[in-house]
Amino acid sequence: MNEPQITEELIAAHGLKPDEYQRILEIIGREPSFTELGIFSAMWNEHCSYKSSKKWLRTLPTTGPQVICGPGENAGVVDIGDGQAVVFKMESHNHPSYIEPHQGAATGVGGILRDVFTMGARPIAAMDALSFGRPEHPKTAHLVKGVVEGIGAYGNAFGVPNVGGEVRFHRSYDGNCLVNAFAAGLADSDKIFYSAASGVGMPVVYLGAKTGRDGVGGATMASAEFDDTIEEKRPTVQVGDPFTEKCLLEACLELMQTDSVISIQDMGAAGLTCSAVEMGDKGGLGIKLVLDAVPQRETNMTAYEMMLSESQERMLMVLKPEKEAEARAIFEKWDLDFAIVGETIAEDRFLIVHGNEVKADLPLSKLSSSAPEYDRPWTPTPAAAEMPALPAIAPIAALKSLIGSPNHAHKGWVWEQYDTQVGADTVRRPGLGAGVVRVHGTQKALAFTSDVTPRYVKANPYEGGKQAVAEAYRNLTACGALPLATTDNLNFGNPEKPEIMGQLVGAIKGIGEACAALDFPIVSGNVSLYNETDGKGILPTPTIGGVGLIADLDDLIAGLPAEGDLALVIGETRGHLGQSALVAEAFGIEAGDAPHVDLTAERRNGEFLRAHGKLVSVATDLSDGGLALAAFELAEAAGLGVTLDSAEIAQLFGEDQARYLVACSEENAAQLVEAAQAAGVPLARVGRFGGEAVAFGGDAAPLAELSQLYRSAFEKSLNLELA
């Protein structure tokens, strides 16, 4: 088959800038073949190379005594004691989910699960952080339905409980939804599998499902802005099969017990290209692939298509040669393909052969570790506009503006479509704070949360970055967990615009400072840039996935308020309304600075709560919606009313950081007050749970009326009642 001629248009269609193409010519000393152009395009795009963010990502704290493996592998690995480790990562599937919501979201789940079990871990939990456009936008309901169905269909069939996440709506996501998928698994800490190849002449083995044309060019598409040609990109979205993935999991874990695996890597973005290059580059080796041996489900596939296909449920492995028969038998038992498609070589070459023709012969290291890296110009985000004087609003009317919005209404419609209990170890389902999953057969548990407030990050990227980490820290400590480590999913617009690059730089600086101050290192992550449509960028959305350890489930804080319990706030309340949920929902404005995060107070208050968790019935962090929304959510979940003493809007709805709302008995409250005074921790009694009404100062409404609004607003705003 004749390959296309290399033209300026073809180079541009592959997402390569003229100076990058010039660099390719200098590296190889000739014009690339069509297949080579595709390989460079895939490896040098933002999705695979992190060329715009790498400089700043290096500044993040990634180590600690608990960290076994930080960024650079398929997922991060953290010690949880007793010879066990938790393996986790968060990754975006934004562009595919906008083009084809069901399959885009489903394969996002599949990809992150493979990242985890590639390391030798059995997945035990998933989460999803979702951002959509305005509820009234013509595409939003379609996207919400498709994405939620896709996540549920894949995760439920695979058999991993979905224990948390976020769902938000904002006009900036109208043309570019975000789907950030998180997965965590358990492994023996001395049996972690890595991706660096070793040994010359070792067989390179293809495992799993067959290769088709789905997803060809997916990584390049994920590194571009959208425009009005978006519907034409549908073929670049992959198609997932969770049953095959489940078989692949079991086959891989079985194989890993046999001392057969030298290295292993899942085939994700850029498929066979990226997995082979990363394995070779990390091991300082070259790779030769013979594509005639690649299992194919379509006819007449070209080398270009096979190298760039993103067909799902596939892995690449470097195998001990003497173990071939044993390994093949395992994969055939699970009805999966097992094919030797190449070998490791000593030279720094990526050699691709198809039909006895050399289709690509490139210096392998130049594709990965020596890929372009940019120090892009950036401008700091200017100070946010000052808060205008707000119109008067009654406290209950203010609460209704929040719970009547899909951003803060009950999200049961979403998580009731997910299997939250499969595996029988889920201790705390989605809905109130962090999800909690027992470490099977033990009294230990792991807590999981995902957090970010994009309004804050836009107004003040540095403080917004700090706050995302601090909120994850609080959500973990609020359930009694010791925060261990984080994964970050940095979703931003076009980094070639200095103001967008400034958002990214500011957020990374804030994230780094918070992670360092809280001993909460980043061990894995993902960067998704060019989240723009027709030149309009999303709110900067650096999602933080946090993982914590509950050493003994007796220390879990996960009850509900009881009749007569006191409501107390740990931490200082100043009444900060800038960029608050109330101002956005009740008045439709986004103004003022983001709340500033005192990391010393965050740590002190979090450690105080963990130390005295036995005294409280329940704890929740105070963030979006402040005290009023948190108190209502706890009361509503318990089927109780709540009375807060203050009627002052700033006291009720302010979003000061480093705060928790706790419920406890009169007797325990006295002990908590005494302990707080001794520790120098601010603690204030703010009200009481009980009765059948929600009252703020003298303003009240029946709990039943508010509960009906809270539990119906999500579906009504999106016309999902009949979905």
UniProtKB/Swiss-Prot annotation:
Task: Tell me the residue numbers annotated for binding ATP.
Answer: 50, 89, 488, 525
Q: Where does Mg(2+) 2 bind?
A: 115, 266
Q: Record's GO cellular component, any one?
A: cytoplasm
Q: In which pathway does it act?
A: Purine metabolism; IMP biosynthesis via de novo pathway; 5-amino-1-(5-phospho-D-ribosyl)imidazole from N(2)-formyl-N(1)-(5-phospho-D-ribosyl)glycinamide: step 1/2
Query: Which Pfam family, giving just one, matches this sequence?
Result: AIRS_C
> Where, by residue number, is the active site?
47, 93
Places the protein is found: Cytoplasm
Q: What class of enzyme is it?
A: ligase
Known catalytic reactions: N(2)-formyl-N(1)-(5-phospho-beta-D-ribosyl)glycinamide + L-glutamine + ATP + H2O = 2-formamido-N(1)-(5-O-phospho-beta-D-ribosyl)acetamidine + L-glutamate + ADP + phosphate + H(+)
Summarize where substrate binds, as residue positions: 92-95, 114, 238, 310-312, 528
List the transmembrane segments: none
Q: Tell me the GO molecular function terms.
A: ATP binding; magnesium ion binding; phosphoribosylformylglycinamidine synthase activity
Q: Known EC number(s)? A: 6.3.5.3
Enumerate the residues binding Mg(2+) 1.
91, 526
Give the GO biological process terms: 'de novo' IMP biosynthetic process
Q: Which UniProt keywords apply?
A: ATP-binding, Cytoplasm, Ligase, Magnesium, Metal-binding, Nucleotide-binding, Purine biosynthesis
User: Per its UniProt entry, which superkingdom is the organism in?
Assistant: Bacteria
Q: What does this protein do?
A: Part of the phosphoribosylformylglycinamidine synthase complex involved in the purines biosynthetic pathway. Catalyzes the ATP-dependent conversion of formylglycinamide ribonucleotide (FGAR) and glutamine to yield formylglycinamidine ribonucleotide (FGAM) and glutamate. The FGAM synthase complex is composed of three subunits. PurQ produces an ammonia molecule by converting glutamine to glutamate. PurL transfers the ammonia molecule to FGAR to form FGAM in an ATP-dependent manner.
Subunit organization: Monomer. Part of the FGAM synthase complex composed of 1 PurL, 1 PurQ and 2 PurS subunits.
Q: Which family does it belong to?
A: Belongs to the FGAMS family.
What protein name is recorded for this chain?
Phosphoribosylformylglycinamidine synthase subunit PurL
